[in-house]
């Protein structure tokens, strides 16, 4: 009995560690790029509109990919879908660090797709596997996500100024999804969940006609708009006035 309890405890600890490490990736690769926008713009000779597109592409990916996340999870399972999200983020970081403006934009879009999957699936995983501790786990992963975002923003400029350049600084951020990827490999071996059918599927279709769902969507959308505008342009604005 004690060995079974110990094994269950280890699995839970690994699951929690994996969730928190995934949470570190869901903002840091976005916030880490913001302080370097001026350097990126100068290096490639980008216009203001093109530079703005770098901060907009992830948001467009969120809007396009997020509605597809549930279908991906039904097809491959939550665990494997989150593994795919980490792979996409790693690939996107590598692509945007290549010496080409085209790859910069492509990599940024790929990163946005990976983050979109993680944003949708991670709260669902917490609700499924920690149904008795949803508030505690949600608070822990939100705190971890915010802390990693702040850490990334603080690190990239000193790293870039130390001789690694903005590409090296952005590439350094791959540490976060790589650690999450490695920690999540044991979880990804779990059997994918069965497709959602019957009343559950009908409920998901009915949500498009729910007034409450649209109100929540509007509230969270405005909240995200304010957050990403500040994250994307706050650092360049402060740098421009010498802070």
Which residues does each PLM region occupy?
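Residue-level signature of mid-helix packing/kink "hotspots" within the transmembrane helices
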Residues: 31, 59-67, 150
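Cytoplasmic helix-loop-helix junction between adjacent transmembrane helices
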Residues: 108-143
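Extracytoplasmic gate region of multi-pass secondary transporters
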Residues: 33-34, 211-243
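Helix-loop-helix hairpin linking two adjacent transmembrane segments in secondary transporters
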Residues: 101, 132-133, 139-189
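Extracytoplasmic
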Residues: 15-48, 66-69, 230-235
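Juxtamembrane intracellular "pre-TM" segments in multi-pass secondary transporters
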Residues: 2-9, 189-216
């Amino acid at each position: 009995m004690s060995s079974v309890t110990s094994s269950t405890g280890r699995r839970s600890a690994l699951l929690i560690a994996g969730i928190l490490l995934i949470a570190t990736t869901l903002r840091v690769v976005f916030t880490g790029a913001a302080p370097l926008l001026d350097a990126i713009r100068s290096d490639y000779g980008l216009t203001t509109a093109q530079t703005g597109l770098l901060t907009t592409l992830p948001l467009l990916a969120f809007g396009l990919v997020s509605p597809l996340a549930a279908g991906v999870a039904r097809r491959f399972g939550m665990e494997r879908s989150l593994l795919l999200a980490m792979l996409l983020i790693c690939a996107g970081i590598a692509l945007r660090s290549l010496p080409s403006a085209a790859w910069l934009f492509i990599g940024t879009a790929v990163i946005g797709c990976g983050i979109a999957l993680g944003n949708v699936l991670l709260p669902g995983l917490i609700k499924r596997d920690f149904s008795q501790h949803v508030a505690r786990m949600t608070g822990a992963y939100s705190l971890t996500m915010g802390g990693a975002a702040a850490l990334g923003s603080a690190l990239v400029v000193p790293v870039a100024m130390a001789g690694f350049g903005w590409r090296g600084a952005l590439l350094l951020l791959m540490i976060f999804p790589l650690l999450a990827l490695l920690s999540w490999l044991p979880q990804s071996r779990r059997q994918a969940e069965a497709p959602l059918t019957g009343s559950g599927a009908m409920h998901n279709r009915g949500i498009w006609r729910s007034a409450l769902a649209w109100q929540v969507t509007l509230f969270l959308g405005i909240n995200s708009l304010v957050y990403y505008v500040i994250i994307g342009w706050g650092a360049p604005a402060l740098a421009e006035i010498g802070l």
